[in-house]
């Protein structure tokens, strides 16, 4: 208590030298009383040290627990968000790919079966013997060459550059077989009405029924029925079976020329029966085509359903984690 009063603070470094310490005057009670006071002060010092240690330990533990809880919650939330996002992306990609593959496989298999059915019934219904079984044994048939019942023309040269520079609504049909044979659309209209087109080069011998305004490229032949005994749709179905048989495959590019097309012979039942058969086959063909067009739409719809349920489950899991963390903190 007394020593600090004699410290020399005038120096740069405060000090209390030995000679000055020896000169400090102190008052003392009797020895017995000194000993009692010293014992009391020692006990008090020990208690203070113990209390300080206990308080320090408690505060450290409490602070550590709070910091640990906060850091754990924060870290858990961050990790959960990162892992959930990563997992969600991976699952979404895997499930979407798997779903697309499964749907494509299923729908493609369905399409193949439909096409087989269509080909079977088309060939069955266009067979003379079967037509007589269905409509009567005495049904008469007439045989014509294509040149006897149709006007035969060929398309003109229409380049891709011409299509780009003359955009419009009317399709240009070419030797292509995808996209219904359409190469593009222009303002011009070379044909308007009910026609049959066939590919003359490349994928030669592919036949299409047309009804409306259109144009044809130079690799596309065009037939216009001129005989009132012939149904254009029925003729198109017959040619889909017969025309490929006359394709010249010895050249570098397969061909079915106007001259060869003109010589093809075909047999026809009465017009009324032609129309009935054509309506049946046309409806069946449309059903197959609708299925083809519906595949991408079906896949897209299933993907949207997948995304919805993924998001729903992800949000539910996040909510459960938040509730669990809140309960633990409380």
Curated annotation (Swiss-Prot):
This is Type I restriction enzyme MpnII specificity subunit. The specificity (S) subunit of a type I restriction enzyme; this subunit dictates DNA sequence specificity. As the bacterial DNA is methylated on this sequence and this is the only type I methylase in the genome, it is probably responsible for all of the methylation on this site in the genome. The R subunit has multiple frameshifts and is probably not expressed in this bacteria. Keywords: DNA-binding, Restriction system. The keyword DNA-binding applies. The methyltransferase is composed of M and S polypeptides. GO terms for biological process: DNA restriction-modification system. Contains two DNA recognition domains, each specifying recognition of one of the two defined components of the target sequence. The lineage of its organism: Bacteria, Bacillati, Mycoplasmatota, Mycoplasmoidales, Mycoplasmoidaceae. Belongs to the type-I restriction system S methylase family. The keyword Nucleotidyltransferase does not apply. SUPFAM superfamilies: DNA methylase specificity domain, MgtE N-terminal domain-like. One of its GO terms (molecular function) is DNA binding. It comes from Mycoplasma pneumoniae (strain ATCC 29342 / M129 / Subtype 1) (Mycoplasmoides pneumoniae). Induction: Detected at low levels after 6 but not 96 hours growth (at protein level). It holds the Pfam family Methylase_S. InterPro entries: Restrct_endonuc_typeI_TRD (IPR000055), Restrct_endonuc_typeI_TRD_sf (IPR044946), Type-I_RE_S_subunit (IPR051212).
